[in-house]
């Protein structure tokens, strides 16, 4: 396993990029710790797969360097980087047995057959494949085949990093949680450096200790799932993570105080005066909004049941504000007042956190 460092990295598919929009991956510096579980999260086309292919050696970056531990591997081809990659669609040898699929990478490296057998059976047991080792891979379900793809990455003890590119795309929804749980369990037991690429926040937040959120080729925030949820550095992160997403409200800054609809709003950190002409917004998640005796006057529009909570949609003038209300909590019949938890309310200028 390895510590992965990306230094001054940029990539464009154009020979002579002339503007910022020509860069598929905009300038970034990232580091993933040795043995860590990480996720690259963002919408389709944001640069996730490009970045993954640069790390694996399938692409050479236009600018910058890729380091595995203290070694610059930027110029190394993929087959010399000791990486394993699991793709969206399971890549297996259908005519081979499950056993031979798992053994294939080891036999290619000339490992003695006794050692091959020991390692294959060890990994098969971890993946719950030991009962089907002699079956042909062609007869397995999609999740079974994806386990083989994963196993071929894990079976090699010299792998620096295992990378997953949307690995649950073709898996039935009711089986996804089982594979997610298995991946997490495997990481906790093996402590191999893993990078998981997905557009699904649930997959990213339940698997990774560190999540990198990308949008439009740019890293907008990197941190733990808790950090991304409680203090989004950009309104995109607030929208993209959470269900429902963060409330983003038009704001002004008057007398040194952020305001919504002319009403003062306390925020987590006393903000500096934002740049002149900046678009100002207040961000607060529905989890940190509550009804109170006073505050922002609103009208209740609709209530939707969501398990232990109800999602309440309210309106102040033309602005919609959502909050979560517990099952046993009383709701105003029509009109009420909203209060924001100061510790989780932020001011944003042109999308970026201002405090």
Description of each model-found segment:
Residues 38-39, 85:
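Short beta-strand immediately N-terminal to the Walker A/P-loop
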Residues 41-43:
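The feature captures the beta-strand-to-loop junction immediately N-terminal to the Walker
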